[in-house]
Amino acid sequence: MAPSEDDPGTGRRAHRRSEPPVRTATARHYLMCRPEHFTVSYEINPWMDANLPTDRDLAVAQWQGLHDLYVSLGHTVELIDPIPDLPDMVFAANGATVLDGVVHSAHFHHEERRGEGPAYLRWFEAHGYTTHVATEVNEGQGDILLVGGLLLAGTGFRTTLTAHAELQEVLGRAVVSLSLVDPHFYHLDTALTVLDGSEGRAEIAYFPAAFSPGSQRVLRRLFPDALTVGADDARALGLNAVSDGLHVVVSPQAVTYQAQLRERGFDPVPVDTSELLKGGGGAKCCTLELCTTSPGAAAAPSTAGPDDDHRNDAAA
C-alpha cells in the first residue's frame, strides 16, 4: 500500500488506495470464422431459441467489428472458411486447444456440432501444426483455458473429466478440473475470463455461482485476488471476454464488470455481439487463441496454407 499521511480532520493516519498495477498489452494470434451460415436451427444451450429469427447480416457486421478491433489493437487474425450446415462454426474457440504449435482437436458433445472438430483440424494440418485427434469429448478453448502455466478445464455440461486426462497427456501441462453447475454457463469461458495468463502474475475474473462449491474453493486457493463478477453481468455473458493483458473486449451490457476492470487497471473495450448471443456466444466464443508460452514457441508454424489464407483480411 502507498505511504500514509496524517488526516488533519481526525488525527489518524489516512491510507491512500493502492494504485492498480501498470498493465501491458501483448500482441496475440487468433483464428476466427466469419458467420456466413449463422442461424439458430436447433437448441443445445439455454440461450438458443429456434423460433426466434436471426439476422445474418447483423451477425456478420458485429463479427466484422470484433475482427477489425483485434487488428486495430495490433493482433494477428487468421481466418478459417465457414462451412454450410455448420452454423455454430463462428464460435471458433470451441474448435481446438492450441499451445506452442501443438493442437488437440475438439470432439463435440452434440451431434449437431461434430463436423466442426475435423474442419478445424484440417486447417491446422494445412498450416503445419502438430495435431492430435481427441478420443474423449472436449470442446476446445470453450472449456480449456491456459492460466499461469496451468490448464483450467471445465466439466459438467460438455467436456468430460476423461478428456482432461487426455489433454494433460497431449500437452504435458497440469490440468485443474472445475465443475460447472449452471446450464447458462455451459462452457468454462462463459463463467471465467483470463485477464492475464502470464506465469507469475496470472489473474482471472469469474462468477462463483457457476461453479460447484468445491471448485469455488479451488479457485479461491489458486487465485485469492481474483475479480468476482455479479449475476447480472455474468448473465449478459460479460465473462465471455478476451484480454490481451490490458484491453478487455467485453459485452456492453456488463457495466459493473467494466467498472471493476478499470479499478484493476485494465481498459475494457465494449463490443456488441448481441446477434451472435442468440447462439450462446460472445467475443471469446468467436476467438480461438493460438497460444504460446515462450518467445521461441511456434504460434503459427506456417503462415500460408494451400488456399493462402487471408490473414487480417476479412472485408465484406
Regions found by a protein language model. Name each.
Residues A2-A316:
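The feature marks the mature, well-folded catalytic cores of soluble enzymes
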